[in-house]
Design a protein with these regions (language model features):
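Short, surface-exposed recognition loops and adjoining beta-strand edges that mediate ligand/DNA contacts
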Residues: 47, 227-245
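Conserved S-adenosyl-L-methionine
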Residues: 111, 145-155, 183, 210-212, ...
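Flexible, glycine-/basic-rich loop-and-beta segments that form/coincide
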Residues: 240-311
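Segments forming glycine/polar-rich beta-alpha architectures that bind adenosine-containing cofactors
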Residues: 117, 121-122, 130, 273, ...
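Secondary-structure transition/capping motifs at alpha-helix termini
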Residues: 122-126, 194-201, 221-231, 431-437, ...
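Conserved Class I SAM-dependent methyltransferase catalytic core
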Residues: 162, 169-232, 467
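DnaQ-like (DEDDh/DEDDy) 3′-5′ exonuclease domain used for proofreading
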Residues: 1-130, 135-188
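Short, solvent-exposed loop/turn and secondary-structure capping segments
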Residues: 118, 138-148, 216-217, 243, ...
Length: 480
């Protein structure tokens, strides 16, 4: 039997519900002073009457206007970022490896406090920060700055129920659905993170639809809108089956510079999934099917999002996949016969001259860099191999699948539900056009960033270092 409520409904809350249906842009958050304490801030829904008046008026309502982004607790977040602490980092030499020589750090503790402590030694020195903060879905938001709370305390904090178990306002989800706490948590940390970046440093932040808008606004304020470099879309095969309408298969990666004017240009990176495409191409070539059949298979393969950027590399030989390009050049006067290797007849030429001298062309033919047709009626083309053209500017849409990383983590019995793929982090780190700098990750989780940095160094001989920061969470008893 349900517990009886010996009081009338909260008509104000019901009226706010009704207004929210008609004018959702008029609903905001405000501090609930009645149910708040110095230790616990409780928020409630409220109506922005200035906006409501405007919604009900055909004319512009008098009053000062200002473009601003604010929330309950914003000023407190700024104060928190600037507040000094009386703590220090304590070395754990017995748990460390190569303590006297390592240049890498793994720090356990609240990342807000750690960021403050790092100001002394790393102020203005870091070239790159990568973070994968909680996406504010409720269960993953553990970074409230008094962060250990029971569900009952959490419900009380956001005003879901009062001490008599009466619902204070309509909100059937967790505190993560209210953006104020998340914005406060991120804002203070972004302020401190910016201090640590060098003038030519950059920060990358993974996020999804829940907070991409608020994160972009926070970063615009902390770093300046002019310093936002890009918002990457990260596409994946892994659908998140948590939506009633659309199967979400993408996330975002926000990239911001400390100062875009001094950030090094020429962000040439290795094309994503190039190793995989080269491997598949070689397997097709070695399968015994004809060259034309291999070409047809690759034409079909590049229609998949994972291989979109290789849509021209649909031929393959003993060197790997290549694209066929024009051998002529506008205004060229280099005209001579190029003989077909089978028919021994001069190949067809266009209205323009060859792009190479006769000596250079002979060398290209000898080195098997020329693609001939079935006979001399087809113009020869130049082979441009993928392995020689693997680096290019990063594209704003990237394809990475986190399923393989999740499976690897589970196989290793690590208790992290949504780890980022190592190749994905390697790609991010490789964007920066140097290989001797320190990467900070203050939401390090399973330390995928550290893994990626070490693996990338092993591949290209770089000397990148890392600083990982993670809350000292309890491990699952079944993990090793």
């Amino acid at each position: 039997m349900d517990k009886m409520k010996f009081e009338s409904p909260d008509m104000t809350a019901l009226n706010i519900d009704r207004i929210a249906v008609l004018f959702p842009n008029c609903v905001t958050e405000m501090l609930d002073e009645e149910h708040s304490t110095p230790e616990k801030k409780v928020y409630k829904r409220a109506i922005n009457f200035e906006i409501l008046k405007q919604m009900l008026s055909p004319d512009v309502v008098d009053g000062d206007e200002a473009y601003e982004f604010t929330w309950v607790g914003k000023k407190a977040a700024i104060v928190e970022a600037n507040k000094p602490i009386r703590k220090t980092l304590r070395p754990c030499i017995e748990e460390s490896k190569n303590w006297d020589t390592t240049e890498n750090l793994y720090i356990e503790g609240d990342n807000l406090e750690v960021l403050k402590l790092l100001q002394e030694s790393y102020l203005g020195k870091l070239k790159m920060i990568y973070i994968d903060p909680p996406y504010n879905k409720g269960s993953d938001f553990i970074y409230a700055d008094d962060f250990m709370r029971s569900q009952e305390e959490e419900n009380a904090q956001i005003g879901m129920y009062d001490e008599d178990e009466n619902r204070l306002f309509k909100n059937t989800d967790t505190n993560g659905r209210f953006h104020s706490d998340w914005c406060s948590m991120m804002y203070s940390r972004l302020m401190l993170a910016r201090n640590l970046l060098a003038d030519d440093g950059v920060i990358f932040i993974s996020i999804d639809d829940n907070e991409i808008e608020n994160l972009t606004r926070c970063c615009s304020e902390v770093f300046g809108t002019a310093n936002i470099i890009a918002t990457f879309v990260i596409a994946s095969n892994s659908a998140k089956n948590n939506s009633k309408f659309v199967s979400v298969t993408h996330e975002y990666l926000l990239c911001i510079a400390k100062n875009k004017e001094t950030t090094p240009p020429d962000w040439a990176v290795k094309k994503t999934n190039s190793n995989s495409f080269i491997k598949v191409s070689q397997q097709l070539l070695n399968s015994g099917i004809s060259t034309q059949e291999v070409h047809s298979e690759l034409l079909a393969l590049v229609k998949y999002p994972k291989y979109y950027e290789f849509d021209h590399y649909t031929y393959v030989d003993h060197r790997g996949p290549f694209r066929a390009s024009d051998l002529t050049a506008p205004g060229s006067k280099a005209r001579y016969d190029v003989f077909h290797p089978v028919t021994n007849k001069p190949c067809k030429t266009g209205t323009r001259g060859w792009a190479y001298s006769e000596v250079e062309m002979k060398k290209l033919i000898e080195d098997d860099y020329i693609l001939f047709g079935e006979d001399e009626t087809v113009m020869p083309q130049l082979k441009n191999y993928l392995f020689e053209n693997e680096r290019s500017l990063p594209k704003s849409v990237l394809f990475f699948d986190s399923q393989s990383s999740t499976k690897w983590m589970k196989a290793q019995r690590f208790g992290f539900d949504f780890p980022k793929a190592i190749d994905y982090i390697k790609y991010i780190v490789s964007m920066y056009p140097h290989n001797n700098f320190t990467v900070l990750d203050f939401f390090s989780g399973s330390a995928t960033t550290a893994h990626a940095v070490m693996q990338l160094n092993a591949e290209d001989g770089g000397h990148r270092k890392f600083i990982m920061v993670q809350l000292p969470e309890k491990c699952d008893e079944s993990s090793e």
